[in-house]
Amino acid sequence: MNTIQVILFAVVLVLTVTVGQADEDSAETSLLRKLEEAEASMFGQYLEESKNSREKRCAVENVPCDKDRPGCCREYECLKPTGYGWWYGSYYCYKKKERLIST
């Protein structure tokens, strides 16, 4: 009789602990889900904009580029080479020249 009570007590204890943990886990996951939804609604647009505004891979100075789709970095422009590279017949990325506006 005494061993049956100990076994029954152990089973009830194990069930109580597992059910209690399941309730805590479900509460944590529901709270986590709510926080993720709130974060997505608040910062979703901002993250999307910052991802798209990031500069993609680009070509630097003296790298061949396509005239129609240059692919040069912001501070460079796609120009036909003058001087030593004119015989290659392709365009290259060169640093943009500072243009002074006369007043």
Curated annotation (Swiss-Prot):
Subcellular location: Secreted
Gene Ontology MF terms: calcium channel regulator activity; sodium channel inhibitor activity; toxin activity
Tissue specificity comment: Expressed by the venom duct.
Disulfide bonds: 58-73, 65-78, 72-93
Superkingdom classification of source: Eukaryota
GO CC term, one of those recorded: extracellular region
Keywords recorded for this protein, A-Z: Calcium channel impairing toxin, Cleavage on pair of basic residues, Disulfide bond, Ion channel impairing toxin, Neurotoxin, Secreted, Signal, Toxin, Voltage-gated calcium channel impairing toxin, Voltage-gated sodium channel impairing toxin
Residue stretch(es) of the prosequence: 23-57
Main location, first listed in the record: secreted
Signal peptide boundaries: 1-22
InterPro entries noted in UniProt: Toxin_22 (IPR012627)
Pfam families in the cross-refs: Toxin_22 (PF08092)
Family membership: Belongs to the neurotoxin 14 (magi-1) family. 08 (Ltx-4) subfamily.
Domain notes: The presence of a 'disulfide through disulfide knot' structurally defines this protein as a knottin.
Name by which UniProt lists this protein: Omega toxin Ap5
